[in-house]
Design a protein with these regions (language model features):
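A structural alpha-helix within SAM-dependent methyltransferase catalytic domains
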Residues: 21, 79, 116-120, 204, ...
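A glycine/serine/threonine-rich, flexible loop-to-helix segment
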Residues: 41, 142, 229-238
Length: 371
């Protein structure tokens, strides 16, 4: 099968392209190779273990179209002769402030709309795309007295006093956590999350209008080789790893007890391969969108992740600062059962060995602008 991978030169997209090729698919890539993400001429960017001038990837066997997913001409060129699309191109991260809203909307929402419209014209009816755990907002919480509840926003006075656990909206008691399934209501709490929900709605509309097969993969905390270095838009794993490389301890906010699901990028790539099989074999071909969590199923705290990285790197022990950011999610832990049932996906990389590898794996060089 000939598969277009948008964002094929990026952190996750490059691993997907490799996995698709290894499975026997013919891969075409579409990537803008923007300097903010991939560096500029004369600056070596680590990619696949190679220092590459200007950050241009050398993917043997990948026909790379250099262009922006918002550009209809570039998208038309990339879609020619393609059987399926794996859409990864996006502006990532949770954003910094309201000034990010236009760019997230432009890149993620408009770009997806341009791609889907072109897929309709080209008669391409198979789509796998990257969504995110951020569409859920806070995770799932249970009160001992009132069952499953949606927690109140955390009170700044509680946070300042070191009380980090969300409270029941009925009785005010601290809540216990549970796993989030795909049926959970969506509650986007920042610009990136809102753009991901919009992508899901666009894909659902495309599937209904065309009868196409669409699978959205809600990635949880992805980590692994080629992750970008520390920027305001990086994931916490990259931020911690960058500090260790600079001889500084990871700074863990709150009390380090925030629970997350850390999933290795190679597992994420394999989930995309299995989703491609699902849309090709009619498992998800009923003219509707099917979304799945992509997660390890083994939650860990942010403090545990920082300690695992520091121990494997041989650096300074993490520092738990007690600092906090208003709007941060306290806990979000995924149920992986939907993807296991329908796609046959189970993560294979254990937390300890994955973090040990990541502690020494090459990172991308710092971007010169937001990415």
């Amino acid at each position: 099968m000939r598969v277009l991978v948008t964002g094929a030169a990026g952190f996750i997209g490059s691993h997907i392209a490799e996995t698709m090729r290894e499975a026997g698919h013919e891969v075409r890539g579409l990537d803008s190779l923007t300097p903010a993400v991939h560096g500029v001429p004369g600056v070596a960017a680590v990619h696949g273990g190679h220092g590459l001038p200007g950050g241009r990837p050398e993917h043997a066997g990948t026909d790379l179209v250099v262009g922006d997913v918002r550009d209809p001409a570039a998208v038309d060129e990339a879609l020619a002769g393609v059987d399926a699309v794996c859409h990864q191109a996006a502006m990532v991260g949770l954003g910094v402030d309201l000034s990010d809203l236009p760019m997230y909307s432009d890149v993620n929402v408009t770009g997806t709309a341009v791609l889907l419209e072109a897929m309709g014209r080209h008669g391409i009816g198979r789509l796998v795309f990257a969504s995110s755990m951020v569409v859920y907002g806070e995770g799932a919480y249970d009160c001992a007295a009132h069952g499953r509840v949606r927690p109140l926003p955390r009170d700044p006075a509680d946070l300042a006093g070191g009380l980090f656990e969300p409270r029941c909206p009925v009785c005010g008691s601290p809540l216990g956590t549970s796993t989030v399934g795909e049926e959970a209501p969506l509650d986007p709490r920042n610009a990136y999350a809102a753009s991901k929900v919009a992508q899901e709605h666009l894909a659902a509309s495309w599937a209904r209008l065309t009868g196409g097969a669409a699978v959205g993969l809600r990635y949880h905390n992805v980590y692994g080789p080629r992750m970008p270095r520390d920027t305001p838009y990086s994931g916490v794993a990259a931020i911690f790893r960058s500090r260790l490389e600079n001889g500084a301890p990871p700074r863990v906010f709150e009390d380090g007890g925030q629970r997350r699901d850390f999933v290795h990028v190679r597992d994420v790539a394999r989930a995309n391969l299995l989703a491609l099989s699902a849309v090709s074999e009619g498992v998800a071909g009923d003219g509707s969108l099917h979304c799945y969590n992509v997660a390890s199923g083994e939650p860990h705290t942010v403090g545990e992740m920082a300690s695992a990285l520091a121990g494997a790197f041989g650096g300074i022990e993490p520092v738990v600062t007690g600092e906090y950011r208003l709007g941060d999610v306290r806990h979000i832990v995924a149920s992986p059962e939907g993807a296991a049932r329908d796609l046959g996906f189970r993560a294979q990389t254990p937390f300890a060995s994955g973090m040990a590898e990541f502690a020494r794996a090459p990172l991308r060089e710092p971007a010169l602008a937001r990415a």
